[in-house]
Amino acid sequence: MRCFERYRLHLNRLSLSNAMMRVISSCAPSLGGAMAWSISSCGPAAAQSAGGGTDPATMVNNICTFILGPFGQSLAVLGIVAIGISWMFGRRSLGLVAGVVGGIVIMFGASFLGQTLTGGS
């Protein structure tokens, strides 16, 4: 119990502002370097304008093409491989199989279902 009282007295001697100054002084060199680097290496932003250039439908089509293309097929293959490895090591679970198969069905079936419901080509 005496040990706790000694630490409590030690903590009472440090005020909050004193503790903050210790933290700030220990971090000052790295903060100063980071600020100097960000000021010296700043330049104009290379962003597109928000008002024009790309139609939202085009952006959605680009995302669908990306997901349904080779990237999505690779994800589907990796999911099936994960199911096979889990079955090989005896960690099979119906939840894992249902989640992966359901995700594949949703990923590849959503485009077809959307086109069917909207009458798109």
UniProtKB/Swiss-Prot annotation:
It comes from Rhizobium radiobacter (Agrobacterium tumefaciens). Interacts with host plant RTNLB1 protein. This is Protein virB2. Residues 1-19 form the signal peptide. It comes from the Bacteria. The keyword Ribonucleoprotein does not apply. It is a multi-pass membrane protein. Keywords: Cell outer membrane, Crown gall tumor, Membrane, Plasmid, Signal, Transmembrane, Transmembrane helix. The chain crosses the membrane at residues 65-85, 94-114. It is found in: Cell outer membrane. One of its GO terms (cellular component) is cell outer membrane. VirB proteins are suggested to act at the bacterial surface and there play an important role in directing T-DNA transfer to plant cells. Pfam families: TrbC (PF04956). Belongs to the virB2 family. The keyword Transmembrane helix applies. Its main location: membrane. NCBIfam families: PRK13857.1 (NF010431). The gene is virB2.
